[in-house]
Amino acid sequence: MTLLVGLGNPTLRYAHTRHNVGFDILDSLVSGLNLSFTFSPKHNAHLCIYKDFILLKPQTYMNLSGESVLSTKNFYKPKELLIVHDDLDLPLGVVKFKNGGGNGGHNGLKSIDALCSNAYYRLRVGISKGTNATEHVLSKFNENEEPLKNAVFEHAKNALKFFIECNDFNAMCNHFTLKKPLAIET
C-alpha cells in the first residue's frame, strides 16, 4: 500500500492558492477516476482509497500536515509515501521528483519530517518565487499564469495516474520530469 498525500490548507479562503497545489492535483486525479474524498475525523483528513493507494488531503493546515500523515501511516501501515507539494524554488511550469532529502523551508514538509522522517517520495510543482514568500504562497495564480498552471496540473495528474498503474517511482520520474517549464500553445 502507498500513501499519496496532497498538501494544502483547508477552507475556501485558501482554495486554489499556490500553496494548495497538492490539494488541487489530488482533487483532479480523484475526480478523473470518478471517485470522491470522504472526511475521516480519525485522521483529520479527506481520504480516498483506490487500488493499493490511500489518497490523503490533511485538514490540519499546512504547518501541521504531519499530524494527519502520521495518523494515517500508523493506521494503514503503507510501505511507501509520496507527497505532492508546491515548490518556491522551481519556476512555474516545472515538475520534479525527489526521494528523501531536505524540506527546502516548506512548512508542510517540515511537519512531516519532524513526525514521520524525511524518507519519502516527492512530486514538486514549481510555483516560482515572489517578493514575499508568505504572501506569494497564499496568493492565487494570476490570469496570465492560468494556462500554464492548468497544463502543469494535468501533467502532474497524469504522472500520478501512471504511478498508480505501475507503482514505480523511478519510471514516473523518467517519464514525467519537466526540468524546463512546460511549453504550451497559446
From Swiss-Prot:
EC number: 3.1.1.29
Site (Discriminates between blocked and unblocked aminoacyl-tRNA): residue numbering on this chain: 9
UniProt-annotated location(s): Cytoplasm
GO terms, molecular function: peptidyl-tRNA hydrolase activity; tRNA binding
Chain sites annotated for binding tRNA: 14, 61, 63, 107
Membrane-spanning segments: none
GO term, biological process aspect, one: protein quality control for misfolded or incompletely synthesized proteins
EC class: hydrolase
Catalytic reaction annotation: an N-acyl-L-alpha-aminoacyl-tRNA + H2O = an N-acyl-L-amino acid + a tRNA + H(+)
GO cellular component, one term: cytoplasm
Gene3D superfamilies: Peptidyl-tRNA hydrolase (3.40.50.1470)
Site (Stabilizes the basic form of H active site to accept a proton): 86
Keyword Cell membrane among record annotations: no
Any matching Pfam family: Pept_tRNA_hydro
Active site residues of this protein: 19
Its biological purpose: Hydrolyzes ribosome-free peptidyl-tRNAs (with 1 or more amino acids incorporated), which drop off the ribosome during protein synthesis, or as a result of ribosome stalling. Catalyzes the release of premature peptidyl moieties from peptidyl-tRNA molecules trapped in stalled 50S ribosomal subunits, and thus maintains levels of free tRNAs and 50S ribosomes.
Subunit comment: Monomer.
Similarity section: Belongs to the PTH family.
Name of the featured protein: Peptidyl-tRNA hydrolase
Name of the gene encoding the protein in the UniProt record: pth
